[in-house]
Amino acid sequence: MEWSGEASVMALQRHGESAVILTVLSRETGLIRGLVPGGASAKRAAMLQPGNRVSLRWRARLEEQLGTFAVEPARARPGLLGSGDALAGVNAVTALLTFALPERDPHPRLADATEALLDLMDAGEGWAEAYLHWEMRLLDELGFGLDLTSCAVTGAREGLAYVSPRSGRAVSAQAAGEWAPRLLPLPAMLGGRGNGGIEDALALTGHFLQVRLAEAHAGKPLPPARARLVARLTASRHASGW
């Protein structure tokens, strides 16, 4: 069995004296792992940083085997290591993907969205909202998407203010009535009437990541890297006023 193409590094794990087990994300394969002989060397360390783009050839005798990678650099993203926020961002993205996705299950749209987000993080400008919409894409790709386009009760597209914590559907302020305290607020950033910032929008996606995604994985908690990113983005917003 053989596959070749480009992918972005998601994770690596030391294996033996000098090898690593590399996990990458590509449009064609989804997440795929392979052994990289000599991958633990200082020479290859920079190339195999999470978020970097690499050119790969994967080979295995049988499809179900781990296989080995021959790896060459394709495009580095040095900006991911250039700031604490960007580093926290790539750590959250790679941790969520390796937590959520089964191996060798292609999600081309999610892979494209991930590449675009990593490019924004590398450039270092205005990627917080893009990260929020990336989480929405992740939920959608895994079958847990939110429907924030119309009210679940009346069908109205105006005056949306809440989200049902169970169905993930929007609810208008008028339709919510006495149930409003039991619903989640829908921030303006996601088309609602709320005034909250990025932390409120991420609290909404975080609820569904935990309830739907984590519980689908035997109740395992979400990777701590996400909480660290949310804390940094919240602090940055309060410091800068965005």
Curated annotation (Swiss-Prot):
It holds the Pfam family RecO_C. One of its GO terms (biological process) is DNA recombination. Keywords: DNA damage, DNA recombination, DNA repair. This is DNA repair protein RecO. HAMAP family: RecO (MF_00201). Belongs to the RecO family. Involved in DNA repair and RecF pathway recombination. NCBIfam families: reco (TIGR00613). It comes from the Bacteria. InterPro entries: ARFGAP/RecO, DNA_rep/recomb_RecO_N, NA-bd_OB-fold, RecO, RecO_C. Coiled coil: none annotated. The gene is recO. GO terms for cellular component: bacterial nucleoid.
